[in-house]
Amino acid sequence: MAVVKPFRGIRPPKDLVEQVESRPYDVLDSEEARAEAGDNEKSLYHIIKPEIDFPVGTSEYDPRVYDKAVENFKMFQEKGWLKQDAEEMYYIYAQTIGESPLGGLQGASGKTQYGLVVAAAVEDYMNGVIKKHELTRRDKEEDRMKHVRVNNANLEPVFFAYPDNAVLDALVARITSTVPEYDFIAPVDGFRHQLWLVKEPEDICTITETFATIPYLYIADGHHRSAAAALVGAEKAKQNPNHRGDEEYNFFMAVCFPASQLTILDYNRVVKDLNGMTDEQFLDALAKNFDVTKKGAEPYRPAALHEFSLYLGGVWYSLKLKDGLSDETDPIGSLDVSISSKLILDELLGIKDLRSDKRIDFVGGLRGLGELKRRVDNGEMKMALALYPVSMTQIMNIADSGNIMPPKATWFEPKLRSGLVIHKLDD
């Protein structure tokens, strides 16, 4: 069963939150962070992407960069741009899609998801109560571990899902009917972000006790952050001769959402060539395993599982997997990412390793089908393949079976904003 606790968050004053908050470190590169921070000295990018304070081209792994993060984190607190709450509490973080002309997702405009910001147990990560569905890379783990170690804090939360729970739904609905502590629309994604404080002892007790009845939590997004936080916590426990188990380093910050509320977008593929085939030869080869239907020049989106959308030569096609070619009892093999990788990318195009092959690139669904069309029409890519989104049920089934999702399979949106709450490991 899941162990969570309240904590004394470090966060910006209400009037500074829009200057401090940022996108998460791993969705943009150094130059994008430099551009977004601009001349805003209060931007969290100075802590989570501190290479922006050095000349262009400075490696994010330079030891001076880690030192700068520590210096800036301390300075933000000294200047009052970040302040620690006086008492332990939980937080409720709401994200609403399509609150502005700047943002919005097809079919999801106005949808809100409500997450509980908690301190999750390192022990739960180690013993499998917190379930994973992705492999992590050691180099990325090491980078995040350094940030956690040197700052002695979880600067950014991890994104968890949990099976829907009526008690938590009711508590969240009641508290979010009041005025939030933060309420703003992010300039980049155009989504609305709100935060409430959960201070009442009864409510805190209800959250803690209800999570203790939930058998598993699922990492939706942030596998490297989860691994780094848990490994640093375990390190600190080992190094402390008086370790008790209730120290703050035994926990790491997560935002937990009911599984049914989450939005998973398509994660699409663009490929540079047809492996020596002409357009006609490629379409003929596809017809062996798919019913191929020409749809025309207007962008066409797959309508169901096992249907794919192909853009080739200025034309969109529907590719429907023929009956009997998917084993629905196989949680991995029946995924559309697995089917497309095996029957199209590997067998026809000769792309064996999605992580390393330079002939393929990936486009998150937030960019829309227009981005696929653009990259083919400008000659950069030869074809694009759009997939139907993976469901949260599929992800949970794979995690429950102890399996790992294929690479580039999930794209959760909205992303959590960073800088709304920070968790210190020594309190």
What do the predicted segments below correspond to?
Residues M1-D427:
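Surface-exposed, charge/polar-rich loops and edge strands
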